[in-house]
């Protein structure tokens, strides 16, 4: 399968891609390499992933509609996994434009690319904020 993973240099993206590469999947990873998290850590993760011939990286911001359209038009993805986001409720209040660009505009570009190119499966990460205020120490599948 050919799989697109957005946010590939992040913690979850990096570890997911390592597992997918262990299964001999073909992975195209994209990340904007912004400074929300340590850029050197992101680059070190990418250096490890690039050792596998089934991985290729493109520095693309998912909010860039034309770059995303070109990426989808030039690839036939079987699966798209969207892990690119600006995380954190506090950050969204302090930096609303960056939050909207990544989490709304960017995600819409992922959705539209997937729709127009007839991607079979789309997986996206949500937020722990969807659980609301929880008085317990942890959430269960029944909460």
Where in this protein do the model-derived segments appear?
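N-terminal Rossmann-like NAD(P)+-binding domain of SDR-like oxidoreductases, especially those catalyzing
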Residues: 1-143
